[in-house]
């Protein structure tokens, strides 16, 4: 099924992932590709990390400990090695792992008594890493802060908090570091405010992007373009200037259905998204999309 137009035409295949009989997707929240174009899916059923090759063939799986809480998923290369950074919303942790699943670093809740207590929970939804190794954690389902750590896990600072003014957030659901302009910038999917905020790495607001989006979830930067899943049933591409390029697989009826996102199988269509939550692209520009639905869905968009 071909979707898109012009330079953004793709063959859409929601049946790409070939799972073994003993693994079933839960809610598919995150997806990344490594330097060899292998694809890793982060979902809520054990084993939570499932590895495929570019053709969708199953390669490996691990990560039972993240069952139920698997959410944010980020791949970062350091010193010639690639690492996975994850957030677990159930246990309130961030972890750094090798591509084989060995845990290198774990971060719990920051010790901020003025921000967190028994009632005000810490629920990290996403994580990103700057070129210098600093780690940024978005507390999207908790108290709407972004926390910054050094590469070794030492706490540096926090910024944000609840609000709608620049620099404040309402569900900072996704976070990523953009280096397209040379100077790194922090992109935050301020989902509850229906916008994207761009900040310095110190947390100072720079600009707000709020057109042609509804519920931005996360980001992936490929070449000059930014790709993001809009939870309200579409994947969106913006250019380097933060301007709209196109929507892919848009279905503006899906998220309005009773019971969404857990819709009956008969509703899903091969050329439309329902609840895209995570996205990535490989070297060739093929796009992979993970959807938030009870039995998961992972789609490959092969660039034409």
Where are the regions that the model predicts?
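Eukaryotic scaffold repeat domains enriched in small/polar residues
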Residues: 1-304
């Amino acid at each position: 099924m071909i979707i898109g137009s012009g330079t953004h035409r793709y063959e859409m295949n929601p049946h790409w992932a070939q799972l073994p009989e003993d693994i079933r997707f839960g809610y598919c929240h995150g997806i990344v590709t490594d330097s060899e174009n292998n694809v890793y899916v982060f979902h809520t059923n054990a084993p939570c990390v499932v590895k495929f090759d570019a053709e969708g063939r199953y390669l490996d799986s691990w990560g039972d400990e993240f069952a139920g809480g698997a959410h944010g998923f980020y791949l970062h290369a350091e010193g010639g090695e690639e690492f996975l950074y994850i957030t677990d919303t159930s246990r309130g942790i961030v972890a750094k792992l090798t591509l084989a699943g060995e845990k290198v670093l774990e971060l719990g809740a920051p010790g901020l008594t003025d921000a967190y207590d028994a009632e005000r929970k810490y629920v990290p939804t996403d994580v990103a890493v700057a070129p210098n190794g600093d780690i940024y954690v978005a507390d999207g389902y908790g108290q709407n802060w972004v926390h910054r750590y050094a590469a070794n896990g030492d706490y540096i600072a926090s910024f944000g908090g609840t609000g709608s003014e620049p620099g404040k957030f309402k569900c900072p659901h996704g976070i990523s570091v953009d280096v397209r302009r040379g100077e790194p910038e922090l992109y935050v999917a301020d989902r509850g405010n229906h916008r994207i905020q761009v900040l310095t790495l110190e947390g100072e607001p720079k600009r707000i992007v709020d057109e042609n989006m509804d519920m931005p979830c996360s980001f992936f930067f490929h070449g000059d373009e930014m790709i993001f899943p809009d939870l309200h049933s579409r994947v969106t591409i913006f250019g380097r200037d933060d301007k709209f390029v196109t929507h892919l697989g848009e279905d503006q009826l899906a998220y309005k259905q009773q019971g969404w996102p857990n819709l009956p199988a008969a509703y899903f269509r091969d050329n439309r998204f329902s609840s895209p939550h995570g996205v990535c692209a490989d070297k060739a520009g093929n796009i992979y999309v993970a959807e938030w639905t009870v039995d998961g869905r992972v789609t490959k968009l092969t660039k034409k």
